[in-house]
Amino acid sequence: MTITNGKVSLKHLVTMETLSNEEVLGLIQRGIAFKRGEKVELDRKYYASNLFFEDSTRTHKSFEMAELRLDMGMIDFDARTSSVNKGETLCDTILTMSALGVDICVIRHSEVDYYKQLIDSPTIQTSIVNGGDGSGQHPSQSLLDLMTIYEEFGTFDGLKIAIAGDITHSRVAKSNMQILKRLGAEIFFAGPEEWYAEEFDVYGQHLNIDDIVETVDVLMLLRVQHERHDGDGGFSKETYNRLHGLTEERYKRLKDTAIVMHPAPVNRDVEIDDSLVEAPKSRIVRQMQNGVFVRMAILEAIVNGKA
């Protein structure tokens, strides 16, 4: 599948499922163009607010950087000092932002599907960009992952991609398995069986990491999401690393052309050996870099939808 020129216009971006293949590829194309230095002048001043109700470094700060690069006005929001602490609902918070003239709200929230009430509201005019909804979806992370893969291989068709780790609790995994399958990749899963659900079988086969490490083009590691587990009393970092992580021994068995990805933050010496985070096959830092450019593309598409 190739990328062709095309203008992407979006009202909201809340899941990967709402995007057509053409829109996905168009956003990747714009991300690559921004990375190459392309400039864009918006037709007016647009205002964005980043509302993060869960901790974030990369998503939060890369959206801020994307907004700055597009010369958008940023309306500060800190959940710790907002009226949320007085009992204000998320819907009323966003209704307020809309009334103030905020054009785009980037939101991360622990509630899965939090965005549904917002995009269905007849009075909220601001566009919603989902920065992660609990263990639901993470579309902007998925798009930066796709951009990173496309830069490397120039296609998705026929690529063998393994998603390895804490799959059940990962919004990144859910977004990626759906879109990568749709774009023609062959998906495999690896990791503890207790963190895997049968519903994922429609996308790919669950195997031991040692059975797939030599054949995959992309090894996409996932963070162990301790904060979403009921209890980690029996969890051992050493055991996880030995059974499911990317060790130096497994790294040596990867194909010469294979790449290693991780959405970060990385639990070093758990999902991946500390020595491998910046190894030659690792694209973890590039993913972070691409996050700025693909989020510029997302914001531009939202602006296009308002023109």
Swiss-Prot record:
Any one Gene Ontology cellular component term annotated for this protein: cytosol
Swiss-Prot/TrEMBL GO biological process terms: 'de novo' pyrimidine nucleobase biosynthetic process; 'de novo' UMP biosynthetic process; amino acid metabolic process
Residues at which carbamoyl phosphate binds: 58-59, 108, 138, 141, 264-265
Keyword entries, A-Z: Pyrimidine biosynthesis, Transferase
Superkingdom of source: Bacteria
GO molecular function, one term: aspartate carbamoyltransferase activity
Pathway annotation: Pyrimidine metabolism; UMP biosynthesis via de novo pathway; (S)-dihydroorotate from bicarbonate: step 2/3
PANTHER family: ASPARTATE CARBAMOYLTRANSFERASE (PTHR45753:SF6), ORNITHINE CARBAMOYLTRANSFERASE, MITOCHONDRIAL (PTHR45753)
Name listed for the protein in its UniProt record: Aspartate carbamoyltransferase catalytic subunit
Source organism per UniProt: Streptococcus suis (strain 05ZYH33)
